[in-house]
Structure formats: C-alpha cells, structure tokens
C-alpha cells in the first residue's frame, strides 16, 4: 500500500472516533460521569467536562457513523475501510454490521480515552480546560485504537500515521470550535 493510500485509510478508519469525540462536546452537558465525587487527592475524579449524556450520545454517534461508512462501502464508496477490516471481522457478515461494530469500538473508545485523560489531568493538578500537550490530543486516539484492535489488525505504520494526523486534526478542530463559540479556549 502506498503512503497516500495508507494516510487516507488511516484517517478514514478513525472518522467514527474523531466525530464521536467532537460530538460529545455538542451533545454533552448534564450529569458528570464522576457524579461529583472526589478522589484520594481531594480533587474531582474526572470533573464536569465529561458527562454521561456526552459520552453515551457521542459513542452512539460514532457507531452510527461506522454504520454509514459500512453502507457506503456496500456501494463501493470508501471500500478502503473494509478491504482490510472485512477479513478481520469473521464473526459478522456484511459491511453495515461490521461498520456498526467498528464505529461502536472507536466511538466509545474515544470517549473513554477522553475520560481517562481528564482523570490523569486532575491527578497531575491541571484545571479543566488547561492544556496538557499530547495528552489532550492523544488520550482518545490511544484508547480508541486499543478498543478497535480487538477486531481490526493495525500495522505500526497505520498507528504512527493516525497519531501524527490526530495531533494536527485535534488542534484544528479545537480552533474551529473556539471560533464558533463551542469552546472557551482555542486548544
């Protein structure tokens, strides 16, 4: 596979994770995942930024996006997503069910990763909204890749490309969210 195809495939694979992570901001609000509980260090377990509504809605949104990508692959559009993964997911037949599964794993993996990142930021005494370079950009990526690797084989090259691309996409998406007043900070 040439490098441009690998970059395209890597980005295409991660679309459910990227969109789930962004949609949690849009659909979020309500009850925090930690229910307001504090940890042994007298700081919030996760904080108000990670909510049940954002996590559930964002994760389901990732699953729907995966299903849509599967539907597109059924008609030959975006088949890169499934040229490699279809042979890996042998217990499900059809692009749409496989897409739903991959989207579910990527979407919820991204949001669990974001919650883990918030937990780590609280333990390191960073306030909500304060930047922690690389952790902010990669928490959701690493966990979503761990989740999806249970059904999809990922090459080292793909993982490196996904990490590099994700850093820049995350920064760009945050700047855009700041410009349209969805975020209070540009990072």
From Swiss-Prot:
Q: What PANTHER family does the annotation carry?
A: CDP-ARCHAEOL SYNTHASE
Pfam families annotated for this entry? CarS-like
Q: What is its main location?
A: membrane
- UniProt EC number: 2.7.7.67
Cofactor(s) recorded for this entry are: Mg(2+)
Which gene is the coding source of this polypeptide chain? carS
Q: Where are the transmembrane segments?
A: 7-27, 58-78, 100-120, 137-156, 167-187
Its catalytic activity?
2,3-bis-O-(geranylgeranyl)-sn-glycerol 1-phosphate + CTP + H(+) = CDP-2,3-bis-O-(geranylgeranyl)-sn-glycerol + diphosphate
Q: Which HAMAP family match?
A: CDP_archaeol_synth (MF_01117)
Which taxonomic lineage does the organism of this UniProt entry have? Archaea, Methanobacteriati, Methanobacteriota, Methanomada group, Methanobacteria
Offer one example of a GO biological process linked to this entry: glycerophospholipid biosynthetic process
Q: In which pathway does it act?
A: Membrane lipid metabolism; glycerophospholipid metabolism
Record's protein name:
CDP-archaeol synthase
One annotated GO molecular function: CDP-2,3-bis-(O-geranylgeranyl)-sn-glycerol synthase activity
Against InterPro entries, the record matches this protein to: CarS, CarS_archaea
Which key words are in the record?
Cell membrane, Lipid biosynthesis, Lipid metabolism, Magnesium, Membrane, Phospholipid biosynthesis, Phospholipid metabolism, Transferase, Transmembrane, Transmembrane helix
């Amino acid at each position: 596979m040439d490098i441009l195809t690998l970059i395209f495939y890597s980005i295409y694979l991660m679309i459910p994770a990227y969109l789930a992570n962004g949609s949690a901001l849009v659909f979020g609000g309500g009850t925090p995942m930690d229910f307001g509980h504090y940890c042994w260090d007298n700081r919030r377990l996760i904080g108000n930024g990670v909510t049940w509504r954002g996590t559930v809605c964002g994760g389901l949104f990732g699953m729907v996006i995966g299903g849509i990508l599967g539907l597109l692959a059924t008609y030959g559009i975006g088949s890169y997503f499934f040229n490699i993964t279809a042979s890996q997911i042998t217990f499900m037949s059809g692009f749409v069910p496989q897409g739903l599964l991959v989207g579910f794993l990527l979407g919820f993996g991204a949001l669990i990763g974001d919650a883990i990142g918030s937990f780590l930021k609280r333990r390191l005494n960073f306030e909500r909204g304060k930047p922690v370079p690389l952790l902010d950009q990669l928490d959701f990526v690493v966990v979503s890749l761990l989740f999806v690797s249970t059904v999809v084989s990922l090459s080292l090259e793909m993982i490196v490309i996904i990490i590099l691309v994700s850093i820049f996409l995350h920064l760009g998406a945050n700047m855009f969210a700041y410009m349209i007043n969805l975020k209070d900070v540009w990072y």
